[in-house]
A protein has these predicted regions:
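PLP-dependent amino-acid enzyme catalytic core
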Residues: 1-490
Length: 490
């Protein structure tokens, strides 16, 4: 089992090395050329629990023993999710909501970032690497806290998270600023998520920087979904949701299903593509964007153009103009053409845009549909669904629900991926149901609970009473200097 870079066929490594390295030296992402060669036996998975399905999925992607895989899965999830199903499926009208927010930080990122530290520890042992790992992560809100919580006090790892100072919700910011753990560091930047992500990607290809870290016996890795070890765990919940539909007689084994996915960095929806490649019967993957609809335009026209205003929306985790995981899809739909992908990424870096061939666009459109919702659509959808069904959507799931309503396919079962608790975006959710207010987000959290009776996740209760531990704010071009200065604190 060999991974290679999306941009260079000659850069090949084993799965453990891919997990530890995160990003290829020249900036490419690691992929399996023969993805889909081995399929899941879905029939034998019917009736299995989350842990058992996860073990079968991981076998197709990592070079660990069965015992190692089992230990990784159990250590990741046992006792850490407040719902025993991990990712339960809830019926809503004629569709289904896959609730992905029962982890330690109330966002879907917990699924991948609870397992990634276990994969990282196991990979370090397998490759007999004596260096420690420095996890560098950019976040638009949810990844940061989930990564910090996942890697907190994990032996031989250090983690630094960078987030846009004015680009996350108050709850998300407070979650990160109050993070505990002797190996954690959090810093805001003046800029947006794309600035943070681009800054980190540049450090991964900065040989001088990496050599300096090696003198301290430290190697770089990432907890963003550019790391294949973050992406693979997300494949599992697509399979699990499908199997639940089968066991509850909502569909027959083999029936195709639509998945509607609120999308920013393209990792969550790409996990659905991976699931389909290993045997899941998927009709369409529906990419739901907010007003930063660069993916919507690309999936319609084949032109990816980030030369546009970056908009702050009520769904901040999707406020992204450079969707990193799209590169992996381009690799597969181009017939694993590393040279072609490298040329597209070069165009994107130099001009801010690229255009795929008509043939490749057609291949993408065979599996992907798209839609977008603006802030007004989003807030109206939250209000409409709550008043009609007493179900409270967060602002990202509401984008997906609005897109589903616009494109409703009654021939197939539709599953909406619900990516976060509504309490992570309290102000926007509260003001969707009520008049605008100047009250702080934590006051509104309690008022929203009183109004809706939806339980506040334990990790968010009393968050405002915790000690603020991380207050640093830097310019976007100061990340390298900051990391080298602060490493000694970890």
């Amino acid at each position: 089992m060999i991974y290679e870079s999306t941009r260079d066929i000659n850069r090949k490594i084993n799965p453990s090395e891919a997990i530890l390295q995160g990003l290829s030296e020249e900036g490419g992402l690691f992929v399996l050329r023969d993805l889909g060669k081995n399929k899941l036996d879905l029939k034998n998975l019917v009736g299995k629990n989350y842990y058992e399905v996860a073990e079968e999925v991981l076998k197709l992607f990592v070079d660990f023993s069965e015992q190692e895989i089992k230990a990784c899965v159990e250590n990741a999830y046992k006792g850490k999710f407040s719902n025993e199903k991990i990712t339960p499926l809830v019926e809503l009208n004629d569709s289904y909501v896959l609730e992905l927010f029962y982890g330690p930080t109330s966002a879907f990122k917990d699924v991948g970032l609870s397992l990634l530290p276990q994969l990282t520890k196991t990979a370090l042992t397998k490759v007999n690497d004596k260096n420690d790992i420095l996890i560098l992560t950019a976040t638009s809100g949810d990844t940061g806290k989930a990564a910090l919580e996942g890697f907190k006090d994990v032996e031989r790892t250090k983690i630094m998270v960078f987030y846009p100072n004015d680009g996350v919700s108050t709850v998300q910011k407070t979650q990160m600023q109050t993070q505990e753990g002797k190996n954690t560091k959090v810093c805001a930047i003046h800029g947006n998520f794309d600035d943070a992500q681009s800054g980190i990607k540049e450090l991964f290809v900065d040989e001088e920087f990496k050599k300096e870290l090696l003198t301290k016996n430290i190697k770089l890795s990432s907890a963003n979904s550019i790391n294949i070890g973050r992406l693979i765990p997300q494949v599992v919940y697509y399979i699990v949701s499908y199997l639940e539909l089968v066991t509850t007689d909502k569909i027959k084994l083999g029936d195709k299903v639509n998945f509607v996915v609120p999308t920013g960095n393209f990792g969550n929806i790409l996990a659905g593509y991976y699931a389909e490649q290993i045997g899941l019967p998927v009709n369409k993957l529906i990419c739901a964007s907010n007003n930063n609809n660069v993916l919507y335009d690309f999936l319609k026209t084949g032109v990816y153009d980030k030369n546009r205003d970056f908009l702050k929306t009520v769904s901040p985790s999707m406020d992204i103009l450079i969707s990193s995981n799209l590169e992996r899809l381009l690799y597969y739909v181009s017939g694993c053409d590393n040279v072609y992908v490298a040329s597209l990424m070069k165009d994107l870096k130099e001009t801010g845009r690229f255009e795929v061939t008509k043939e490749i666009l057609n291949r993408i459109q065979e599996k992907f549909q798209t839609g977008f919702a603006d802030d007004l659509d989003t807030k109206q959808t939250i209000k409409k669904i709550y008043e009609k069904d007493s179900y409270l959507l967060d602002t990202h799931t509401a984008v997906a629900y609005k897109v589903l309503l616009d494109k409703l396919d009654k021939e197939h079962v539709n599953v909406i991926l619900s990516t976060a608790s509504p309490y992570k975006f309290t102000e926007s959710v509260y003001t969707s149901l009520n008049e605008a207010t100047n009250e702080d987000e934590f006051t509104l959290m309690n008022k929203l609970h009183e109004q809706t009776k939806v339980a506040i996740p334990e990790n968010l209760k009393d968050l405002d009473k915790k000690e603020i531990r991380h207050k640093d704010v830097i310019n976007k071009n100061e990340m390298k200097k900051y990391i080298l200065e602060k490493l000694g604190d970890l």
